[in-house]
Amino acid sequence: MSRPERLQPGVKLRDADKVSRIPVKVVPSERETMLRKPDWLRVKLPSSSQRIDEIKQALRSNGLHSVCEEASCPNLAECFNHGTATFMILGAICTRRCPFCDVAHGRPLKPDAQEPKKLAQTIKDMKLKYVVITSVDRDDLRDGGAQHFADCIREIRLLNPEIKIETLVPDFRGRIDAALDILATEPPDVFNHNLETAPMHYRKARPGANYQWSLDLLKKFKERHPDVPTKSGLMMGLGETNEEIAQVLKDLRAHNVEMLTLGQYLQPSKFHLPVERYVPPAEFDELRVFAEEIGFTHAACGPMVRSSYHADLQAQGKEVK
């Protein structure tokens, strides 16, 4: 049996090429077998606007990336028009192959040492008051990218002293304590790490990740920074039950997580995991009530909710659906 061809740095693998070597194979969906989107998910998206064009141009001119574009987020137009964006640092190539995610897989390029300064200047030019900084998984880096996160936070605050910063971090697999030591030098205003789904679905949805590791990351950060809110997000529609999701919410609270986002999974292409169920808005409302009953201070639950969707409003405690 021949070895698989070695990936070249900077080459993006998507769709079938991306998911070809995951433990639970994804069978490409046929159109006639795909669930029809219900009316509550039919959102009319504007093709463009001056604000959308301005933000895209600012990103392009500085060589920056937004997860809004790279992950094909359905809320891109709304968020860009609102003047918010979630910046994706450390490149646009992930070392993982999660079959729910539309971000490309491959061998990433070396981190751009100038990215923290370019990011800070772009945020200043855009006059943003609240930003979310996330990244691809960088298993190729000894610290998982933690130092780059800290550098970005420091540079952003130097140019934007009044800004609030939320970080949506990867799991720093195998290097949690080292990563947290680094992040302690520049802690964010909100610390976010997504569990994504219930543990029994990790093998098919999050190959390479571990449910308990992710919970431990959130708990250990909170122990070090008790005044910084911790946050996590989940998708629904991957085959989980509401009872399984309720147990995940209990696990999050047991690990001192205070903020929650819960939204509907949408299949990016026929090569990604299929949607097994569209969850009605009423069920999201029921889970929001349950989350608040067990102690979450903020719970944004609804079909179109994403981890960074109106993150500024979530942080203010305003209701987001």
UniProtKB/Swiss-Prot annotation:
It comes from the Bacteria. SMART domains: Elp3. Binds 2 [4Fe-4S] clusters per subunit. One cluster is coordinated with 3 cysteines and an exchangeable S-adenosyl-L-methionine. InterPro entries: Aldolase_TIM, Elp3/MiaA/NifB-like_rSAM, LIAS_N, Lipoyl_synth, rSAM. GO terms for molecular function: 4 iron, 4 sulfur cluster binding; lipoate synthase activity; metal ion binding. Its EC number is 2.8.1.8. GO terms for cellular component: cytoplasm. SUPFAM superfamilies: Radical SAM enzymes (SSF102114). [4Fe-4S] cluster 1 binds at residues 68, 73, 79, 308. Its main location: cytoplasm. [4Fe-4S] cluster 2 binds at residues 94, 98, 101. The keyword Lipid metabolism does not apply. Its cofactor is [4Fe-4S] cluster. It is an enzyme of class 2 (transferase). HAMAP family: Lipoyl_synth. Belongs to the radical SAM superfamily. Lipoyl synthase family. This is Lipoyl synthase. It comes from Shewanella woodyi (strain ATCC 51908 / MS32). The lineage of its organism: Bacteria, Pseudomonadati, Pseudomonadota, Gammaproteobacteria, Alteromonadales. The gene is lipA.
